[in-house]
Amino acid sequence: MLLIGVAGTELSAQERDWLQHDAVAGVVLFKRNFGSRSQVAELSAAIRAAAPRPVLICVDQEGGRVQRFREGFSALAPLQSFGAQYAQAPEAALAAARAHAQLMASEVRASGVDLSFAPVVDLGRGNRAIGDRAFSDDPQIVATFTRAYVQALHGAGMAATLKHFPGHGTVLEDTHVDHASDPRPLEALQAEDLVPFVAGIEAGADAVMMAHVVYPQVAPEPAGYSQRWIEQILRGQMGFRGVVFSDDIGMAASLSAGGVAGRVHAHLDAGCDVVLVCHPELVAESLQAVQGRRLNTAALIGLIGRGALGWDGLLAGTDASFTAPLSAHFGTTA
C-alpha cells in the first residue's frame, strides 16, 4: 500500500484518478496543502469522496518547527520543552505533554484528518533532523513521555505512530539530504534507543515509522527496508503487531535501494505495510511498480479516526479540565 502526496490545496483530475487505485491507502498532507482551517477540511472531504474505499489522511503536526497546519490552529510547543520541564516538575511536565497530545489530536481530527505521525520517540542527541522534536536525551525519560503521549492520543480518538524506528537521534546526518550510519551493536541500541519503542508498544501504539538509517552491525541496509529490523526484531523480538510505515522514499537516504520501483519493492518486501510517496512526481511510477502485488488493505482500518469531529464538535466538547494545562504552555492560535 502507498500513502501519496498531492501537489496543492485542491485535488487535480490526475490526483483523483490516483485515489481510485487499489494500492493507494491514503494521502499525506504538507504545508503546501494547507491554506486555512476550512480549506483543509474541504480537501480532506474531497480526498474521501474521490476514493472508492475508506482512506487514511495523515499529517506531521508534531509542534515546534514541524507543524504543517498553523493559521487557525494552536501553536504547539516542541516536545523538547516537556523534557526540559521534567527535571523540575515531572508531573506537571507529563500533564502538559498529555494536554499537547489531546489538543493536537482534537484539532487534526476536527479538520477531517485521521492522524498525525506522532510521537517522535528518538533520543535527542544532536541529530540535525530531530533537534527539539525529541523529548529528551535520556531513554527512560523519553519512555515515560511516550507512554503518556500514546495514551493521550488514544483518549482523543487518534492512533499513535512511534518514529523513527529503531532510533534516529544519535546519528548526526539528516536523512532527508544525506546517508546516515550508526555503528553501534544491537545490544547498545536495545539498552538506549529501543527503550522508548518498547514503552510505546506496551502502551498500545498502533503504528511505527521506520528510519532511513543503516546500522551495519545489525543489517547491511537501512532499517526501513531491512527484513531483519522489521520482521525479526520489531515484530519477532519486540512483539509489535501494528502497522509499519516507511519514511518518505523521496528522501536521500532511501536512494540506496535504487530507482522509484526499487525503493517501493524493497520496503514492501522487507515488511513495511505502507510506503510513503510524499513527492507527487514519484506517485505514477510508484503505482506502476505495485501493479499486481498482493496488498494488505485490512492493516489500516484501525488507524482511521472515529469519524471527522468537525470544529463545532471540538469546541462543544472543550471544557476547563482540557484547557487548563494548555494556556501556559501553548498560548494562542498560530
From Swiss-Prot:
Pfam families to which the protein is assigned, alphabetical: Glyco_hydro_3 (PF00933)
Chain sites annotated for binding substrate: D60, R68, R133, K163, H164
GO terms for cellular component: cytoplasm
Enzyme Commission number(s) from the entry: 3.2.1.52
Known pathway: Cell wall biogenesis; peptidoglycan recycling
Main localization of the protein described in the UniProt heading: cytoplasm
Entry's localization field: Cytoplasm
Gene3D superfamilies hit by this protein: Glycoside hydrolase, family 3, N-terminal domain
Site, as annotated: Important for catalytic activity: D174
Database matches in SUPFAM superfamilies: (Trans)glycosidases
Catalyzed reaction equations: Hydrolysis of terminal non-reducing N-acetyl-D-hexosamine residues in N-acetyl-beta-D-hexosaminides
Record keywords: Cell cycle, Cell division, Cell shape, Cell wall biogenesis/degradation, Cytoplasm, Glycosidase, Hydrolase, Peptidoglycan synthesis
Function: Plays a role in peptidoglycan recycling by cleaving the terminal beta-1,4-linked N-acetylglucosamine (GlcNAc) from peptide-linked peptidoglycan fragments, giving rise to free GlcNAc, anhydro-N-acetylmuramic acid and anhydro-N-acetylmuramic acid-linked peptides.
Protein name: Beta-hexosaminidase
Organism field: Xanthomonas oryzae pv. oryzae (strain KACC10331 / KXO85)
Lineage of source species: Bacteria, Pseudomonadati, Pseudomonadota, Gammaproteobacteria, Lysobacterales
